[in-house]
Amino acid sequence: MEKISSKEKIIFELRKRKKDVYFWAISLSIVLIILIFICTKENSLYFVLSSMAQTLSFIIIILRVTQNQSCSEISINYLICFIIMLVSRLITNIFSSYDIEISLINSIFLYLSQIISLLICFYLLYLIYFVYPETSDKMFDNKLPFYYILIPTFILAIFFKPYIFRNRIFDVLFVFSIILESVAIYPQIILFTTKKGEIETYTSNFIAFQGLSTVFILIFWYKNYAFVNDRKSLLLGGFAGYAIIVSELFQLIFMGYYFYLYFKSIMKRKKIKKFDL
C-alpha cells in the first residue's frame, strides 16, 4: 500500500471541503477590501461595501449553479426584483448627481459591482429558462410574485419622494430602488420556507452575504437619512429617510431567525433544515 504524502493529504482535504474554501476565500477578500477602503473615511464606503457584498453573493450562487448544473433554490421573482432595482439605481446614478461625497475609487468599485451583479442576474435567468429549466423551483416560487412587491413599492416611492435631484422621475426612481432593495429578498426566503429538505451550503452563504449587504446599507442610511428628508414636501418626502431605515430594519428582523440557523449550522457543520425555518 502506497504511503500518502502530506501534500496529497492537504490537496485531498481542500477538494473535500471545496465549498468551505470558496466561502472563506470570499470572506477574506471582503476583509481585505474593508481594510483598503476604511482609510477613506467616507460615508459612501458603507454603500460601496453593501453593493460589493451583493456581488459576492451572486458570484457564490453562480459557482453553485455551474458546478451542480442546477438552478434549484433560486427565486425567479427575487432576480426580477433585483434587476429592476439595479436598473433604477444605475439610471439615477448615471443621469443625475447628488451631494453625498464619494471618491473616484469608491465610484469605480460601486459601478463595477452593480454592473457585475446585473449581468449575473440576467445570466441566472437565462440558465433558469433555457439551460436548466427542469431544475428550477417554479412550482414553489409562486407565493409572492414580483409584481406584488413592485407595485406597492412604487406607490410608496411616490409618497415618500424627496426633492434631491430636482427631477420628479429621478427622485421617485431613487427612493423606489432603495425601498425595493430592502424587500426584494422576500421571495427568496419564502421559497426556502415552502420547499422541504435542506438548504445547500452555497445557497446559505448567498443569503448570508445578502444579509451582510443589508447591515452595511443600514449603517450608511443611519449616517445619511437626513439627506433624503425633504421638509418642503407636500406628501411624505420629509420622512423618506426614516422610511428607508425602517424598511432595512424590517428586512433584518425578517431574516434574523434564518441567520440564527445559519450560524448554528456552521458551528455544528450541518446543513440548515428547511422545516426549521
Locations of the language-model features?
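Alpha-helical membrane-protein topology signature
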Residues: M1-L277
